[in-house]
Amino acid sequence: MPVPGTTFLRHFRDAYVDALGEARIQQSYGFRSYERFGIVGAASTDAPVVPTSAVAGLQTMVTRLDDRGREVGLGERVPLADALRAYTVNGAYASFEEGIKGTLATGMLGDVTVFETDLFAVDPDDLAQVKVDLTVSGGEVVHAR
């Protein structure tokens, strides 16, 4: 099951072009292709290699633009709902924990992140700027702004 660091293309586009060529990076981290072929893909970050910003990862998945606004395989863009699922439901599935986390439901751990605004109301190009107001993990507040 692929679990790519979704911001690699955002931060390292030029290195990928140098190593793989322009044509091959267009398909890299191809969540749209995963879906088309019935592959479940989970999204991740890879600290300290890249910042641990899931919202930057969401932005990259939805826009397929690097940090300079250059396109990286627009055909691999996914809707925001699919990108969120890759970080939540599919992330739990990847770690064999789908029975205890990944969704908000009775009997689940109830891990949750609260953003300062409705992500679906934000321009996709601005997702990386959205702040996290609160994070609850294992019933404990682990981040509060």
Language-model region placement:
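His/Asp/Glu-enriched, well-ordered alpha-helical/loop segment
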Residues: M1-A121, D125, V130-G138
